[in-house]
Amino acid sequence: MSVVFLLQTRPGFERDAQQEARTVALERRGLELKPVETGEGFVLLQSDAPLTPFGWRDLAFSRTLSRVIADIQLGDRDRLTPILDVVGQKAMTFASIWLEWPDTNDGKAMSGFARKFQPLLEEKLATAGRLGQDASTRLQLFFPSKSRVLVSVSEPQWGAPWPLGILRLRMPTDAPSRSTLKLAEAFEVFLGEQGQQDKLKPGMTAVDLGAAPGGWTWQLLRRGIKVYAVDNGPMKGSCDGHPLVKHLRQDGFRFRPPHPVDWLVCDMVERPGRVAELMADWLAEGAARQAVFNLKLPMKKRAEALSDALERIEARMLAAGLAYTLQVKQLYHDREEVTVYLARPAATGRRRR
């Protein structure tokens, strides 16, 4: 029995998402995924085995994933009946219903339609007894256009906990730059609510490499963390002269703190391999316990550049004989880059993405 997977991604990164998913499925489960369709902001892959070879956390370039149960061409008038007919054939109860679309300008125009359509669908399914509080499966309707819907299902371990796989955050009014949203999203995605409470505590220390104007430093300060802000550029706003900030106009690749710190964060514009090696050196040497950093990827061969950078990290940590956690995601607030979380020690040993 073949299964088709829907992977949602940032527009322009579809082939990277496809390449990565096929590689991960083959290396981890011995499953060959066959390309079915590459659209704008999504990819369809087919497997001959009824297994889900990965979850959304295992893939850097895919925001979320689900299993397609129907691909329906819709008419102009009645879009509800064909969907109800398909769902009615499945002996499934759903915890919730999400309407989704590609993260494109045309896709975003679907949001108005979704606001009107979703209550109608929920009412029909609730009346039919297909919605239940004890269910875990989520029904996801992905509209590449108004005339087509991919009906799919997802479990919590497969798909991201946000529609479209997008965690939307509000820009803080007093943050020095919009880059602050990158670190805020990274903490939420990699640590979760409980992890942030446990690992981001007042009184901790951190180093921010490439800190100016202070977007990432601001996220640390709001949690009461002392920051060495390393950058030749000026800090701005509340980060300029803050009592918890020590601004050092030094080379980020040469700086080391006088004592080990709890956190290392870095958003420097540099080759991904060089940044990866620097981050791994810090943790292997014991200069930092955890790190969040961005890898700026080249326009061509992005998946290859990412794989090379991660292999450099793994080689360094292996040479040091250290257990570690390694996770990678292209976050919503990232652009031509991915964000990496690297930590030691890892209670369960190595965890690649």
Swiss-Prot record:
It is an enzyme of class 2 (transferase). Keywords: Cytoplasm, Methyltransferase, rRNA processing, S-adenosyl-L-methionine, Transferase. One of its GO terms (cellular component) is cytoplasm. The keyword rRNA processing applies. Pfam families: FtsJ (PF01728), RLMM_N (PF21239). Transmembrane segments: none annotated. The keyword Repressor does not apply. It catalyses: cytidine(2498) in 23S rRNA + S-adenosyl-L-methionine = 2'-O-methylcytidine(2498) in 23S rRNA + S-adenosyl-L-homocysteine + H(+). One of its GO terms (biological process) is rRNA processing. GO terms for molecular function: S-adenosylmethionine-dependent methyltransferase activity. The active site is at K296 (proton acceptor). Its EC number is 2.1.1.186. It is found in: Cytoplasm. S-adenosyl-L-methionine binds at S179, A212, P213, G214, G215, D231, D251, D267. Its main location: cytoplasm. NCBIfam families: PRK11760.1. Catalyzes the 2'-O-methylation at nucleotide C2498 in 23S rRNA. Belongs to the class I-like SAM-binding methyltransferase superfamily. RNA methyltransferase RlmE family. RlmM subfamily. Monomer. This is Ribosomal RNA large subunit methyltransferase M. The gene is rlmM.
